[in-house]
Amino acid sequence: MAANLSRNGPALQEAYVRVVTEKSPTDWALFTYEGNSNDIRVAGTGEGGLEEMVEELNSGKVMYAFCRVKDPNSGLPKFVLINWTGEGVNDVRKGACASHVSTMASFLKGAHVTINARAEEDVEPECIMEKVAKASGANYSFHKESGRFQDVGPQAPVGSVYQKTNAVSEIKRVGKDSFWAKAEKEEENRRLEEKRRAEEAQRQLEQERRERELREAARREQRYQEQGGEASPQRTWEQQQEVVSRNRNEQESAVHPREIFKQKERAMSTTSISSPQPGKLRSPFLQKQLTQPETHFGREPAAAISRPRADLPAEEPAPSTPPCLVQAEEEAVYEEPPEQETFYEQPPLVQQQGAGSEHIDHHIQGQGLSGQGLCARALYDYQAADDTEISFDPENLITGIEVIDEGWWRGYGPDGHFGMFPANYVELIE
């Protein structure tokens, strides 16, 4: 708990004021606690100085002393605060009163020296005055006036400070000054000369560099003219960028699966001896279905027989077959077909024939698919990326399929165009 200064406040304040008043004979005041409480009370005051105050200290109590003494150096009044903790005070009380020191220091303001004492050796008057002397600042001594006016007797005349001029020393001094002035001037000239030479060397280097660049530019221009074309640095840079872009495109295209299939197809076309390009497959039975549906069943086997030969154009021909017969057969099978869109785009023409016609159409379609090689039905929509691929919609039929790779096949699309398509976009028809 904090120290209580309000209970005995007037008495405490009165004792403090009597000590700090310079004309008051009271020069010390002693404060302590009331029993084991935290209430501060006045233990005593006196006019006998430090010797009298020391005798009032009790070794079994916690006490606070505030004294007025004279500075031995300046003779000015100084105030000393002594925090006394007797040797007989128990540890619990010491711990409780340790926080009251700052409270008492705030109440007893103006102390020049603060002493924490526990034994009589710490509060001896000589020891206290020594600390006061050290706290007053520098250890100086004040001169005391022995007399305002003193007759010290006649004073001797003031001596002259005139010195005769020495010509030799003067000449030496002047010569020395001129020597240093000349040295400074020479140093300044040397620095200016070095600066001028550096600037001249820099200008010469710049001139040589410009001349060298002009000569190199002239040689390049002459070399370009000799090669038969005028080139500029911008054009050279553009050509380099074109080469880099072309190389990058070639590398990217070499990695793309579609380009791999294109290369395989070109290799197959160059190695084959006489493999004609597959043309658009003409469906004889479709044309005759639209014109003569009643006679279609009689001529369908011929178309079914000739279709497998069209689906395998790369088979090696028989050695005994002359080229003219092969050409004749190809012309018989590969005619310039009309657009096959009518087979898928115009189903109403067939539906107008009635229920009997629909049965005939399904039968004809089954016979046609059986003669067109491997067939598949589209599951998803796919749009061709270039002219080497085919486009189709869901439920479209793809005929004449060639399995050239695990992921990409080739076949005839709904429009009769032959090209590649992704294998996972279709399902095979058994």
Curated annotation (Swiss-Prot):
PTM sites of type Phosphotyrosine: Y334, Y344
Family membership: Belongs to the ABP1 family.
Gene3D superfamilies: Severin, SH3 Domains
Highest classification ranks of the organism: Eukaryota, Metazoa, Chordata, Craniata, Vertebrata
GO cellular component: anchoring junction; cell cortex; clathrin-coated vesicle membrane; cytoplasm; cytosol; dendrite; early endosome; extracellular exosome
Membrane topology: Peripheral membrane protein
Description of its domains: The SH3 domain mediates interaction with SHANK2, SHANK3 and PRAM1.
Listed CDD domains: ADF_drebrin_like, SH3_Abp1_eu
ADF-H domain residues: 4-133
Domain SH3: 371-430
Protein name, entry field: Drebrin-like protein
Keyword Protein biosynthesis: no
Species per Swiss-Prot/TrEMBL record: Homo sapiens (Human)
Compartments (UniProt record): Cytoplasm, Cytoskeleton; Cell projection, Lamellipodium; Cell projection, Ruffle; Cytoplasm, Cell cortex
Gene name, Swiss-Prot/TrEMBL: DBNL
Biased composition (Polar residues): 233-244, 268-277
Pfam families for this protein: Cofilin_ADF (PF00241), SH3_9 (PF14604)
Modified residues (Phosphoserine): S160, S232, S269, S272, S275, S283
